[in-house]
Amino acid sequence: MASGNLNSADNPLPCHYHRYPTRSAWAKRLLSIASLCLLIGFLASCGLITDGQASNTGSLKTVAQGSHGQFTYVAIGASDTFGIGTEDPYSENWPTDLAGMLGSNVHLINLGIPGMLVHEALSIELPIALDSHPDLVTIWLAVNDLVAKVPVDRYSHDLDLMLSRLQASDPHVPILVANVPDLTLLPYFKTYDPLVLQSRVQAYNAAIAGIVQQHHVILVDLTRQNYNIEAHPEYISGDGLHPTDLGYMQIAKVFYTTLQHAQEPAKKP
């Protein structure tokens, strides 16, 4: 990892990068999560939820299209998962777009919380994800850790722990983990040392790729090839950091395409 300051002296980099969502959006999201927790607790106490129900060994595409009942998709993340950058983060975010692509009977549980770090998500978001017995999990948690200067080895440890707990609960659930886009292309970072920032992005992405390979989960590549911010400035909102609704739609497409390719049977030589 490169040494030096990640940010310029005149523009200190905040530990948690985000604009706060509207009060109504927060209220809706928190009410939904609270209601979900109460429902899960009630069903578990009645013996209506068991570990066996979490298994998902069939085709993801078939299940999502509705042949096996409701399909639960859990999105773990931060402000980018929440939907910051749009007029209505509660409904305009990439997990909602992805859920729509997967099928009409998909039940989305969006756990994205602005400012979230992976270490914090282990105790805040992960327990809800586990109790939900998901059929699909996406994880996009890296940029907050990167800008907060969390050491790569500490970040790797926490991400590894998150995946281990998810797979211990259900070894068959598909899990997609996204990496870090090219932050040097974002207007928000224009005053920062691009070489240091790029080096840190590369270090994080190398760590993410290694952990994804170790756990045999699916890597979602959001680097320039798939999410070209430079060619599509309309993907970025007025804060110079978070995506617009168009940007979120493109991110959802990258997740969906990656998932579809991962589900395809391996070609015979």
PLM features: residue spans?
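Short, conserved catalytic or interaction motifs in soluble domains
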Residues: L48
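Alpha-helical cap/lid subdomain in secreted, periplasmic
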Residues: G100, S123-K267
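Sec-dependent signal peptide hydrophobic core
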Residues: L30-L38
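Serine-esterase "nucleophile elbow" of acetyl-processing enzymes
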Residues: D51-P114, L126-D131
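N-terminal secretory signal peptides that target proteins for export/translocation
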Residues: M1-A27
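Subtilisin-like peptidase catalytic core
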Residues: I109-I113, L117-L122, A142
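Gly/Ser/Thr-rich beta-alpha loop segments that engage phosphate groups in nucleotides
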Residues: S79, G85-E87, P114-L117, N144, ...
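C-terminal motif of bacterial Sec signal peptides marking the signal peptidase cleavage site
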Residues: A44-S45
